[in-house]
């Protein structure tokens, strides 16, 4: 969980109408946090399509073998983006959710640690992937997905998020040699 109380009321960098569908939910999931809720955007077909089109645009000419989508909202965006980009989709899940053999990557939270995993045979070594999540906050989950990709010796061509919460400075902790694109910033 990240404290985004400082994100409330900020303006967006996105000029598109669809950005108005992302709403602030105060004190969720706990007191003092303002949650950026993308579900109203997801429920509107034309606006969701516009957001996906904008998210896909920078990657349309990039050769890809798959999109790695991070649980849970990264699944929604990642699978839709994979279809848009005509490539495969690989889920990156919380522990114990994937059958078979998996690779695990631990990452730091504000208080403690968590883990994500993916199938160890998800893609062949050297496959070109795009990592996708809904929100870049502190960057821990994205960096963990980058770690999983490194374990599989995948080539990460970039990362894409729908929303970046700039005040939480997740971008400053990101790998400089891997492009990280946010469709919308607060």
UniProtKB/Swiss-Prot annotation:
UniProt pathway annotation: Purine metabolism; AMP biosynthesis via salvage pathway; AMP from adenine: step 1/1
PROSITE patterns associated with the record: PUR_PYR_PR_TRANSFER
Matches recorded under Gene3D superfamilies: 3.40.50.2020
Its EC number(s): 2.4.2.7
GO biological process: adenine salvage; AMP salvage; purine ribonucleoside salvage
Single GO term (MF): adenine binding
Keywords carried by this UniProt record: Cytoplasm, Glycosyltransferase, Purine salvage, Transferase
Keyword Transferase assigned: yes
A Pfam family this chain is assigned to: Pribosyltran
UniProt-annotated location(s): Cytoplasm
Gene Ontology cellular component terms for the protein in this record: cytoplasm
Catalytic activity: AMP + diphosphate = 5-phospho-alpha-D-ribose 1-diphosphate + adenine
Claim: Glycosyltransferase is one of the keywords in the record: yes
Coiled-coil segments: none
Function noted in UniProt: Catalyzes a salvage reaction resulting in the formation of AMP, that is energically less costly than de novo synthesis.
Subunit structure: Homodimer.
Family: Belongs to the purine/pyrimidine phosphoribosyltransferase family.
Protein name: Adenine phosphoribosyltransferase
